[in-house]
Amino acid sequence: MKTPKNDVYTVSRLNGEVRQLLEGQLGRIWLNAEISNFAAPGSGHWYLTLKDNFSQIRCAMFKGRNQAVTFRPANGQQVLVKGNISVYEPRGDYQLLIESMLPAGDGLLAQQYEALKMKLAAEGLFASDTKRSLPANIQRIGVVTSPTGAAIRDILHVLARRDASIEVIIYPTPVQGTDAAKSICDAINLANSRREVDVLLVTRGGGSLEDLWSFNDEGLAHTLYNSGIPVVSAVGHEVDMTISDYVADLRAPTPSAGAELLSKDADNKAQKLLSQLSRLKQSWQHYQLKKQNQLQACEHRLQKQDPQRRLQMYEQSFDEMQLRLQQAMQTKLHAYTLKQQNLSSRLASQSPQHRLDLEAQRLSYLSAKLNGAMIDKLKMSEQRLAHRAQQLDTVSPLATLSRGYSITLTGEGKVVQSPSDTCVGDTLTTRLRDGSVTSTVVEVG
């Protein structure tokens, strides 16, 4: 069979191309997993395996990176790591080169927020050219919020002060909790189906990242994007930026600011300026996000060409050989220890003292057995004697007397069996159960 020379790979070439393919396609990723096989050799690098219930992947975190970790990793610990997929060419294994590590849960929401923001930005949901202008003459405002929260009270207060003619329709919904995001989507869809308002104000008061998390939902982002009614997002405080703020047609820093944005007053120019500033801020944020993505892509390409990676690979190979040598030495030492224990056991089994101990145990056993046999024999004899005594007692005259019978004896002690055994004038003794009676024969019949 002929093989074209151009199609024949060497192992090194194959591993090199696999490395370029994996590193070029996947880039930087986040991974949530459990640590196992953690090792920290003298080089300062860390080697570990990250796993879940079904799979595992080898990982390396070099000294320059792990010095920034604020805790000591341990086997069984759940962590969140960021890194790049790479191929360790000498062994043909693919691995994750870890750049940063956090305990699982710490920063996880922030990481999910950033990941979703990048995804939706790539899908075009934040694009400025998709934003709609607000109606020039707003008569009805639909407010999507909790009917009992502070946000709706602030909104109604601002509208009453600035323009009491504006009608407010509340689409009540929970703004916090497990099902809040779905409820908010349902309220927006309801408003779109009724077509009774000019603009929607999706809002709630301030809170922690967890409290505002319903407004970082991917489903809600698409619902806002697909809304046929212009949407203003006013979630939290000035410093809070949620996914809904990026997707909405306009963002207000607070619920009160949202109400001011949608109502007219004497200073209409200020309202327009606020709108323009909000759009400018969104455009600047989109520009920053785009440049951040470009910077990360450049950093990734630079890492692939960095000679430091080659040095790290050699250091990793050295560390692995050192670990294998330590394991081999421990295995050999364990084998010698077992052999020594086996020889000691065999020597102890051949010792005369051991045989003497065995014979002493045997003698003690036989003595105990003999004593037991003698005791059993004595018990059997006692039982036989008791049985014989019972039999004798059964035929004893005394036993007969106890049943109400009597025995009559002559003066010489002979048993009287017939009247002919007596004469008139003889003295007789009659034995009873509990005594005797003496009588004199006066007549023989």
From Swiss-Prot:
It holds the Pfam family Exonuc_VII_L. CDD domains: ExoVII_LU_OBF (cd04489). Keywords: Cytoplasm, Exonuclease, Hydrolase, Nuclease. InterPro entries: Exonuc_VII_L, Exonuc_VII_lsu_C, OB-fold_nuc-bd_dom. GO terms for cellular component: cytoplasm; exodeoxyribonuclease VII complex. The keyword Hydrolase applies. It catalyses: Exonucleolytic cleavage in either 5'- to 3'- or 3'- to 5'-direction to yield nucleoside 5'-phosphates. Its EC number is 3.1.11.6. It is an enzyme of class 3 (hydrolase). It is found in: Cytoplasm. One of its GO terms (molecular function) is nucleic acid binding. Bidirectionally degrades single-stranded DNA into large acid-insoluble oligonucleotides, which are then degraded further into small acid-soluble oligonucleotides. Heterooligomer composed of large and small subunits. This is Exodeoxyribonuclease 7 large subunit.
